[in-house]
């Protein structure tokens, strides 16, 4: 009994002092939290956030860690978490602002800044400290990096931790998840959505998915001006990004053929074109008319295969440099990066981990496969240099002070913002400088989950001491209502703007709204409503900017009003 008492209370004996005690407490908090996160009520789970609540319970009963160790593990966990997020979202961060992505990100910004305005209004009306209100804001929008950024900013400003930030987050978080899902469901009935029609339009890329996905379309050549022209001569005339994957000539042949830049078109030829939905209408009008063709049945010798880019020397090279068509007689028709299909244009730079779709004969595709790699074993080997180099650079960037007018203290990006920005930049521009930034999804997820688990456990342990007293005696239960207001009002406002001003497809809209609250349970709910990828594409398009703004605004609120 004495041994167990010493172990749990952390007395400096028997098990090597406080180390065994700290590891035990931290491990139990994380393990119990993850187990509780498996529980679903009405199909909704709080996931790893249960770690925070278990930590609060442990902290309430004084099962805690050394103060300095607690602070270190919390910050280190936060760094791992935000850095892994940056690696994931970085490749698509800047491209998300192009064309339709710009509109979706504008809508997400409305959600973010509406929440900030409501938070400020409640702060001035009720007199609740801004530290508490920022915690409520982060919980209401289920944004853990925002919580970390707020705590970091407050620590830089005052030199001490503010447990009320974590308390506000913990109180608002559960209904932040539920409130977001209920808002998405409410919009469905308010807009009287015809689900079949919306899903059909989403499948065609209508409703601001036109620039964010690619689709195949079969066309018959009817434009007399194209008769006898080569593909490479036609591309500048169309002024659209597209790939002609296959062709069947009107010369009695029943089989389809691959296309290269010197292939000539003739009236009546049937072609398979890969392009973004917004370009398909113009491309169709230019070539002729859409038709239905079963391409797989026309030539059994042609196969289509997805191949992974796993050779480091290909990192940053363009498709034109690889000369797949000239060397092997196969065609690259599309490139999948981070779950999004891209048009395989000659200028597209490849990255480690890209999945390219190649069409050709079995022999040609096999030769191309050897050149590209397609070795999961090679991808599974972690590239640790960019991770730790990026974390080091992120810590340096996060420590640089920036002066803003009206803010008495210099603003620092901190240990949340610095590593996030560096990881986005490295993952986006690293391949151009031959820096391998790819990590497998499982490895990235492992880093992220370890980071968020450490962070939430430490936040809960630190906030547990005064949690019950705050809720019962200091009016903490009212924070729940404030959190619901911050959750629901911006979503409904943005929902109406997105539907009636931006004419968004419903499934795209709910994906954007889920992404603007960085809410994975809401995305899971949205995906369950439809078989199309519109919610996931909408979520992924706005997630990077939203995450960045949540971190930045949380810091600015603390530094300007703290």
UniProtKB/Swiss-Prot annotation:
Protein name as catalogued: Uncharacterized transporter BF2507
Species this chain originates from: Bacteroides fragilis (strain YCH46)
Domain RCK C-terminal: start-end pairs: 204-286, 289-374
GO molecular function annotation: monoatomic cation transmembrane transporter activity
Entry's transmembrane regions: 15-34, 41-63, 78-97, 104-126, 165-187, 384-403, 413-430, 450-472, 476-498, 505-524, 539-561
Pfam family, one: Asp-Al_Ex
Keywords: Cell membrane, Membrane, Repeat, Transmembrane, Transmembrane helix, Transport
Xref: InterPro entries: AAE_transporter, RCK_C, RCK_C_sf, YidE_YbjL
One GO cellular component term: plasma membrane
Cell location: Cell membrane
């Amino acid at each position: 009994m004495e041994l167990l008492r010493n172990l749990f209370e952390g007395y400096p004996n028997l098990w090597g002092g406080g180390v065994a005690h700290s590891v035990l407490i931290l491990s139990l908090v994380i393990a119990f939290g993850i187990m509780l996160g498996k529980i679903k009520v009405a199909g909704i789970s709080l996931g790893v956030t249960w770690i925070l609540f278990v930590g609060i319970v442990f902290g309430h009963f004084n099962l805690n860690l050394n103060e300095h160790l607690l602070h270190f593990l919390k910050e280190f966990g936060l760094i791992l978490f935000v850095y892994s997020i940056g690696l994931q979202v970085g490749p698509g961060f800047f491209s998300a602002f192009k064309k339709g992505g710009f509109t979706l990100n504008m809508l997400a910004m409305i959600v973010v800044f509406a929440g900030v305005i409501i938070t400020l209004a409640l702060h001035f009306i009720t007199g609740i400290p801004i530290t508490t209100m920022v915690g409520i804001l982060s919980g209401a929008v289920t944004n853990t990096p925002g919580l970390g950024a707020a705590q970091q900013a407050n620590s830089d400003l005052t030199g001490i931790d503010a447990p009320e930030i974590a308390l506000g987050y913990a109180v608002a978080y559960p209904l932040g998840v539920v409130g977001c899902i209920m808002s998405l469901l409410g919009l469905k009935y308010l807009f009287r959505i015809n689900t079949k029609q919306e899903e059909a339009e989403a499948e065609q890329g209508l409703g601001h998915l036109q620039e964010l996905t690619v689709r195949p379309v079969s066309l018959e050549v009817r434009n007399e001006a194209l008769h006898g022209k080569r593909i490479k001569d036609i591309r500048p005339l169309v002024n659209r990004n597209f790939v002609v994957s296959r062709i069947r000539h009107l010369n009695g042949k029943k089989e389809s053929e691959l296309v290269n830049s010197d292939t000539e078109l003739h009236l009546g030829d049937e072609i398979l074109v890969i392009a973004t939905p917004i370009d398909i209408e113009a491309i169709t009008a230019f070539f002729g008319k859409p038709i239905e063709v079963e391409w797989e049945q026309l030539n059994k010798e042609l196969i289509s295969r997805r191949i992974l880019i796993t050779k480091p020397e290909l990192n940053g090279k363009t498709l034109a440099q690889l000369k797949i068509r000239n060397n092997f007689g196969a065609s690259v028709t599309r490139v999948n990066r981070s779950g999004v299909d891209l048009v395989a244009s000659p200028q597209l730079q490849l990255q480690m981990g890209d999945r390219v779709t190649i069409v050709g004969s079995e022999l040609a595709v096999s030769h191309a496969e050897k050149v590209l790699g397609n070795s999961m074993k090679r991808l599974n080997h972690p590239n640790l240099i960019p991770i730790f180099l990026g974390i080091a650079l992120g810590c340096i960037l996060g420590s640089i002070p920036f002066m803003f007018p009206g803010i008495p203290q210099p603003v620092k990006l901190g240990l949340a913002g610095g590593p996030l920005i560096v990881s986005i930049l490295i993952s986006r521009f690293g391949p151009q400088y031959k820096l391998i930034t790819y990590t497998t999804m499982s490895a990235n997820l492992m880093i992220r989950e370890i980071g968020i688990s450490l962070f939430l456990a430490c936040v809960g342990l630190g906030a547990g001491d005064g949690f019950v007293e705050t809720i019962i005696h200091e009016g903490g239960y009212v924070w729940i209502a404030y959190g619901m207001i911050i959750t629901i009002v911006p979503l409904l406002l943005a929902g109406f703007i997105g539907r009636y001003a931006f004419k968004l497809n419903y499934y795209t809209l709910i994906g954007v709204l889920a992404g603007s609250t960085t809410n994975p349970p809401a995305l899971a709910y949205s995906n369950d409503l439809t078989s199309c990828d519109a919610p996931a594409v909408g979520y992924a398009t706005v997630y990077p900017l939203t995450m960045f703004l949540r971190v930045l605004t949380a810091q600015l609120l603390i530094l300007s009003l703290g």
